[in-house]
Amino acid sequence: LYYNSKGSFQDVAEEYAVQDRFENGRGTALSDLLYRGRLDILSSNWNGMHRAYVLDGDKFKDISTSPYNDPTKIRTVISADFDNDGYDEIFMNNIGEPNKLFKVLEGGIFKEIKMENGLETVGLGTGAAVADVDGDGILELLVSHGESGFQPLTLYKADITNFNYLRIKPLNQYGAPARGATVTM
């Protein structure tokens, strides 16, 4: 974790209690895990415990529980609203073992969700990304493969028919995303 002081970065991971010295980090994602309007940190570790850090006062606290924090051969962690219910799910892209999907319930309880698409029980996933590729308001999941040799990209589309969406994209005066903007409807 680095603090940006006018373009000069200072390592503050230890100060904020997110230093994970004994794990082999593979991916990081940001998400509002407790739906408080604050970003929390998801940290994934190769064959080590995965972490879910939430800001508690002036330090972060790991709220991860099993089965979320169980070690896996992880390559990527993504937080996104895959089912269009307004709340993020957490996708873990693993190599040589099934991918996993979690929902964070009230109080920070992690519940594994059965995956219809994207499980890839023996896939050699090396990374993943999420976007609304076809513009229908439902996020697609793109998984890359190829640990050794050629393997294709796989694009997964969720079969969702019972949720609606409204896309609002606040921009600043330069056309960039207006981070921290508040939208009132």
Regions found by a protein language model. Name each.
Residues 49-53, 98-100, 149-156:
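Structural motif
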Residues 24-26, 48, 73-75, 97, ...:
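Beta-rich catalytic cores
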Residues 2-23, 53-72, 102-123, 160-169, ...:
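Blade-edge motifs of beta-propeller repeat domains
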Residues 4, 45-47, 55, 94-96, ...:
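Structural signature of WD-repeat beta-propellers
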Residues 109, 114-185:
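Gly/Ser/Thr/Pro-enriched helix-cap/hinge segments flanking short amphipathic alpha-helices
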Residues 35-44, 84-93, 135-144:
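Acidic/hydrophobic-patterned starts of short beta strands in beta-sheet-rich repeat architectures
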Residues 25-35, 39, 74-84, 126-135:
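Beta-propeller blade termini
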